[in-house]
Curated annotation (Swiss-Prot):
Protein name, UniProt field: DNA-directed RNA polymerases I, II, and III subunit rpabc2
Self-association and partners: Component of the RNA polymerase I (Pol I), RNA polymerase II (Pol II) and RNA polymerase III (Pol III) complexes consisting of at least 13, 12 and 17 subunits, respectively.
Any one GO molecular function term: DNA binding
Keyword Nucleus attributed: yes
Predominant location category: nucleus
Organism whose genome encodes this protein: Dictyostelium discoideum
GN (gene name): polr2f
Signal peptide: none
Length: 133
């Protein structure tokens, strides 16, 4: 067998200067981030969120619920029901959360809001009782 002398392989270990180069880079990085924190308004995100909402009387999208909205709505509501959320319809022996969610959807009693985003960044909020299934 041949002895392994190590050759040029350092095993992933790289030598570095212990002269404090890391601390200098860290100081430079924190100085630049402090300049940005002075400019940011903490309520700016909340203010722009309400500006993107379209009022109910100016809605542009259709009143029909898409199959994707229905699937997400049923899945979310079934998850809530499985975690002991209050049920909004009378049960007739159903124990499956998905079947209960279907029954709530048919009765238009699901207490969720569907948010539809538009290409321009605006959005519309629709309640389940406003949409046709």
């Amino acid at each position: 067998m041949a002895d392994f002398e190590g050759g040029g392989d350092d095993g992933g270990y790289e030598e570095f200067d212990e002269g404090g180069g890391f601390e200098e880079e860290y100081v430079e990085e924190t100085e630049t981030t402090e300049a940005y924190t002075d400019i940011i308004d903490p309520s700016a995100d909340a203010n722009t969120a309400e500006a993107g909402r379209i009022p109910n009387h100016l809605r542009k999208t259709t009143r029909y619920m898409t199959k994707y909205e229905r699937a997400r709505l049923l899945g979310s509501r079934a998850l809530q029901i499985s975690m002991n959320a209050p049920i909004m319809v009378e049960l007739e022996g159903e124990t499956d959360p998905l079947q209960i969610a279907w029954k709530e959807l048919r009765a238009k009693k699901i207490p969720l809001i569907i948010r539809r985003f538009l290409p321009n960044g605006m959005y519309e909020d629709w309640s389940v009782d406003e949409l046709s299934i």
